[in-house]
Amino acid sequence: MCRPLSVVAVLGALAVTAPAAWAAAWSTVASPNPSGGQDVLNEVGRLRGTNVLYAVGRTNLGTLVLRSANRGASWQVESAPSPGTGTQLFGVSVRVGGVWAVGYLSGPSRTSTVTLRRKGGTWTRVPSPNPDFADQLYGVVTTPAGTWAVGTGTGTGGNSHPLILHWTGRAWKTQPAPALPKGNNQLFGIAGKGSDLWAFGQREKNGGTLHPLALHHTASGWHVSKTPDPARGGESFFFGGTISGGTVWAVGGRGSGSRHALAERHTASGWKAVTVPDGAGCTATNELTAVVPIPGTKHLLAVGDCSPGPGNRTLVERRRNGAWHQVSSPTPDATGSFLTGVVAFSQTRAAAVGYRTPAGFRTLALIYH
């Protein structure tokens, strides 16, 4: 799942929390910074049943793709096409049949979608539609039902709407999205299990306020799934989500000014906001950017960032025994450390990626072991 760099918040040191149930802890590992000044990781995905991970982002030269063969303990740069220096990758989907990465290229006259595919060890760019004046992709998912990518399209009038693409096996095709009132309507992430597909983002209504947006794909197409707005008129949004068993989860942020972490779940009775703690000492901002199930358990793992004021800290939350708890995680740079993607292997092994801001941008990689 994924989010634009401009909407991720900013800060400074440590994190706290809930008593450890297993003898494992988060630690920082080395990660490449090819450009040495503008390197960011936005998402990470795992090849199921293996120790192989792929992380995507950008450098000051364009796309950035990293690969790990040992569950995130070490990372190597993979050569990947970059249409231009303004190219960023935000979403990645990893399957045995190939790896997809999506994002966009900011050019001098317009912004256009970018889709890359890794097959047979080689990355290639695949043509993708650009129906609007500015089009951006933030999330991608592959299931037995196919591959889907989501983002936002913006017309010349400045209003944005959800952008949904489907890979037919030969080409990307635009899919109809539900009609929404004009405004800032965007999708940042997508999750799927079999033919059950969900997309997550934000919608604008009531004079400019932002509210969580969830779309559900059924046999008749994509539909809005009504979600509660815990901010009650303040700014709220989803960055990403996941499907665990028969439950759909979405995470993001809520509230304007002093923003809080947001988690909601969907069951047969609909969407419901769930209590999730803010980071210890973080009274300025709290955002969760990604969430995944922990294999072999009913637990969930979510990552993001939080801030007590100046600078941002990494934020890790774990749901077990029916409640969310913060998990201690390192913040290598007090000026700003952000987590944007996470994968879980087991109760005692996980990996997360993001970026830090010591001077410019540097990639950030953590492992839980």
Language-model segments: residues:
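Residue-level hotspots at or immediately adjacent to binding/recognition sites across diverse folds
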Residues: 22-369
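Secretory targeting and sorting signals
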Residues: 1-24
